[in-house]
């Protein structure tokens, strides 16, 4: 191996941008979820809408396979956009909680919007 390879690798690793925290808060998700209902969107707004809907879809899918009592029960006829709307409605009433991770705010929002029968 040439002598310069370890130096290049060390420099590359040292200059790499630090990873963002896994989940720093819910504010960004709220911003992204404003776009699915918007008519004309820019490319960036389309990307944000897709990020929102994809995160919610993955979150709901993950919650469906967790053992134990379900924290929420979304009807099968509910669309992803309706789920995003429910999240935005909840976030509008609970702006003080948006410093919490996205998964926490989503679980609380869906627990209120889509409670399970008792």
Locate the predicted segments by residue.
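Bacterial N-terminal signal peptides
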Residues: 6-15
């Amino acid at each position: 191996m040439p002598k310069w390879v370890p130096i290049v690798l060390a420099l590359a690793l040292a200059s790499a941008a630090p990873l963002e925290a896994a989940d720093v808060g819910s504010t960004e998700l709220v911003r992204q979820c404003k776009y699915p209902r918007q008519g004309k969107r820019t490319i960036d707004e389309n990307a944000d809408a897709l990020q929102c809907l994809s995160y919610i879809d993955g979150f709901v899918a993950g919650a469906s396979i967790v053992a134990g009592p379900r924290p929420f029960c979304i009807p099968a006829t509910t669309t992803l956009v309706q789920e995003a709307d429910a999240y935005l409605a909840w976030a509008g009433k609970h702006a003080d909680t948006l410093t919490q991770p996205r998964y926490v705010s989503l679980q609380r929002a869906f627990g209120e919007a889509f409670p399970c029968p008792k």
